[in-house]
Amino acid sequence: MKRNLMVLSYDYDLSKELAKILAETFSMRFFDQIEMFNFHNVPRDVSSMYKECGEDYTKKKLRSVVKMEIDFDDSVFVADIGLVDNCSDLFLKLKHSNFIIFLYKDTADEINDLKAKEYATPEEKALFSSDENLLNKRKLVVSSELADSRVNITGLSIDEIINEVIASIKDYYAVD
């Protein structure tokens, strides 16, 4: 039985908003992987660690945050889809205890969103950004190997997205 929910999307802010609503709806705890990383690595955040320690060390520390989630119960996680590249083996382990919800848009819309997306620092962009080839690769991996639910959110409002996600959860667990 899957004990947690995880929301993955290229729109991190939307994923975070949805995850908070799901946590409230199902009386679960909410966790943001990036906030967990920052908390466990005070005084450094992702950007400052990348500057001071380099990409490899930062990715190793990000992996440790994902690894922690294996021990959680009754929680909703929001994860940056960029972590899938560095932690695909861990995400496959998380799949056993997490109902993974993949929110996606039509490819053309996602490419436009990625081009327009702004990052707080160049370091965040280096860690979490995607080009068109990487977008398609991640989309294939997440959709075929990780996701329990795939919801096309192109043109949907937040309320419609919530309804679609809750319907997919109910369908998965075969409840009304």
Annotated model-derived regions:
Residues 2-5, 73-74:
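Pre-Walker A (Motif I) flank of P-loop NTPase domains
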Residues 24-63:
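Conserved substrate/cofactor phosphate-moiety recognition/catalytic segment
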Residues 60, 120-164:
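Small-molecule kinase domains that catalyze NTP-dependent phosphoryl transfer to phosphate-bearing small molecules
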Residues 94-117:
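Conserved phosphate-donor/acceptor-positioning beta-strand/loop module used by diverse small-molecule
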